[in-house]
Amino acid sequence: MSKSTAEIRQAFLDFFHSKGHQVVSSSSLVPNNDPTLLFTNAGMNQFKDVFLGLDKRAYSRATTSQRCVRAGGKHNDLENVGYTARHHTFFEMLGNFSFGDYFKHDAINFAWELLTSEQWFNLPKEKLWVTVYETDDEAYNIWANEVGVPHERIIRIGDNKGGAFASDNFWQMGDTGPCGPCSEIFFDHGDHIWGGPPGSAEEDGDRYIEIWNIVFMQFNRQSDGTMLPLPKPSVDTGMGLERIAAVLQHVNSNYEIDLFRDLIAAVADVTGATDLSSKSLRVIADHIRSCAFLISDGVIPSNENRGYVLRRIIRRAIRHGNMLGAKETFFYKLVAPLIAVMGPAAAELKQQQAMVEQVLKTEEEQFARTLERGLALLDDELSKLTGDTLDGETAFRLYDTYGFPVDLTADVCRERNLKVDEAGFEQAMEAQRRRARESSGFGADYNSLIRVDSASQFSGYDHVQQHATVTALFRNGEAVDEIHAGEEAVVVLNRTPFYGESGGQVGDKGELKNATATFSVTDTQKYGQAIGHVGILTTGTLRVNHSVEALVDVVRRNRIRLNHSATHLLHAALRNVLGEHVAQKGSLVNDKYLRFDFSHFEAMKPEQIRLVEDLVNEQIRRNMPVQTEVMELDAAKEKGAMALFGEKYDDQVRVLTMGDFSTELCGGTHASRTGDIGLFRILTESGTAAGIRRIEAVTGEGAIALLHQQSDLLQDVAHLVKGDIHNLADKVRAVLDRSKMLERELQQLKDQQAAQESASLSSSAKLINGVKLLVSQLDNVEPKMLRTMVDDLKNQLGSAIIVLATTADDKVSLIVGVTKDLTGKVKAGELIADIAQQVGGKGGGRPDMAQAGGTDVQALPAALASVEAWVASRM
């Protein structure tokens, strides 16, 4: 009996756990240690710093089932998804890793045992082929002599990508750094499927499918191309869960495995599709996985960076739903079936289900408004096309006006055997980006160029003053040996009490001083394992290896501490009042206020805001100790500690506890007791994106200052209404009631005035070819009264064409009324359009009533004078 996808995932982890590997949870799809990476796209991403020697773990062997997304950037499978058997935007990468522990012998034997042992995957040995790098005799001999793979099924692959070490079987992290040969394992589906072995002319066929890649990191590539042996070689492996599931379930397409069969059935159910072989069903089944997990990991649809890639995937899925005949929003309805088929791998997604569904529903509703119009425009453009390529300007207009990502446009074109001029599209996009850059006025960010190899010891939990040594200096992003008075720079110390911005908490400010120099620190940032003090040297000269006294601005730090502790209380209070679906999605903690973003699908009600505020203040009054404890990450999770969105955690984590109310992982600085916070007041509650709410609040001195401001404001209002704070509501209510009464009386007077004006105007109507025409410019008449006057004049004149105008604030207001018996010859909308264009405006309306505005007051008399001739020509 074949294994389910969930059973295969668990079996892989169980196997390597039995071989002494630490089972490590999947990291977020948003990489937290690699700004060059759009999404997590391989199992090794979360261990990159370990392989680079910048991070250490408590274990030397690890195994994971890593969520991955490949859409956008270098790794972009989007256009192929749904059209091939194995392309996905989202997949799970099974992997085992050795950090200087075992190497080729164990890595190869582990893989072979898992794949072929009766206890595990029990694949036929004769169905497995392997490749090695051309000069990797060690790996070749292990496969041939120890494992026993016949020589004819071991293929050496050389440099087949146009350069030294540029090979399918040589892995490189970058132009420099760790690299090494790799060995890939292929499964032979049999001669009933076209394709040849790897390295052959037919290797792109579907007969021989790569199921596992084993990378042997044994070299450190230098900038001159030299390969130096690593002192501790490592292993990084990756096996696509969906691919191995297809093999073990005896199917040839990933979309035929149990997980996708169930998802495709769910897609058919919510869209009403009946043809289960439709490629659109595959597209949607794939896309709900990437979209749901990306949103769960904190990505929100937008027009830039990760948010734009997410929006592209969502909109591609919606378009395919449209092709299937979906008549209403459907995509969000697939989150629940996805959670069901993913099982334990969707535990975090399940906690965020309501928020994810709301984000998807909102995005679909927004796109539905422009989808049909955009498709109609695209159909029209394609019908006029003489060649086989849609121009880039049209593709850009579809993007800019109708929200069509270029790959969606390309999808539609591909279905008609047409192409898109993507180079032309990029030119139009770049022109728009250039305009945006020019209007923004932003300059270069030199700090983003800084790379620091050394580490800084942070002492700020216990100290606000520290003796330290300068280990590095950076000016305009470049390392220098010294800086001089007046120069802006970044100073790195061997140890520091300054907190580097992270976890939503801003960096510290203060001074670095010695006998001859003073450096004013205006911000503190992290650069890898180093802490950089950003600022300006106000006096003297500062050199590398100089000693300094690091002095944190204590008053500012204390205010930040209170605000940070309050965010923890706020988070717990929100979960208590709104529900456990609430999760932190971002924060800002500075010395003035705190800002907290969280997942919730609707605006908070006033009574909920009051409950949250009261609950936080109750915990402040309890004056609970704020305690920290360092423990294993898994132990912290078992304790119920909540993790901060988007933050990277080591194996040893700092757990912050506030009595029995709040337990979170946090590396920030905090109050000693909750009572130190003093007072908590919410300023605003608002929405930032679909499914994301934001609270801004103040604490301590800031909260008291707010109370004073509000009290002063109440006193001012009380003085204005001649009352006091105790009867203020009654006094304001009385003022409002009197104001409404006076407004009604004023309106009655205006109506009477309009009636009198209308009565006097009716006598000035002219007969034009037997039709009454009344044209008048009125003074001291509000524009909104013109309509009432036209209605009165129609009643008085019986059959007539009426044109009234007035001016106010250098603007012209026009109205034309035509009685219904005359609209066959004169239409109000046509007449007013002619008048409006003469006064620099435009307008329109019904045949019997139309309004317009203009900006050229001086042209109004001539424009009104032209009406008589215009009407006469039509009568």
Curated annotation (Swiss-Prot):
One of its GO terms (cellular component) is cytosol. Zn(2+) binds at residues 564, 568, 666, 670. It is found in: Cytoplasm. InterPro entries: aa-tRNA-synth_II/BPL/LPL, Ala-tRNA-lgiase_IIc, Ala-tRNA-ligase_IIc_anticod-bd, Ala-tRNA-synth_IIc_core, Ala-tRNA-synth_IIc_N, Ala-tRNA_ligase, Ala_tRNA_ligase_euk/bac, DHHA1_dom. Keywords: Aminoacyl-tRNA synthetase, ATP-binding, Cytoplasm, Ligase, Metal-binding, Nucleotide-binding, Protein biosynthesis, RNA-binding, tRNA-binding, Zinc. It is an enzyme of class 6 (ligase). One of its GO terms (biological process) is negative regulation of DNA-templated transcription. NCBIfam families: alaS (TIGR00344). This is Alanine--tRNA ligase. It comes from Yersinia pseudotuberculosis serotype O:3 (strain YPIII). The lineage of its organism: Bacteria, Pseudomonadati, Pseudomonadota, Gammaproteobacteria, Enterobacterales. The gene is alaS.
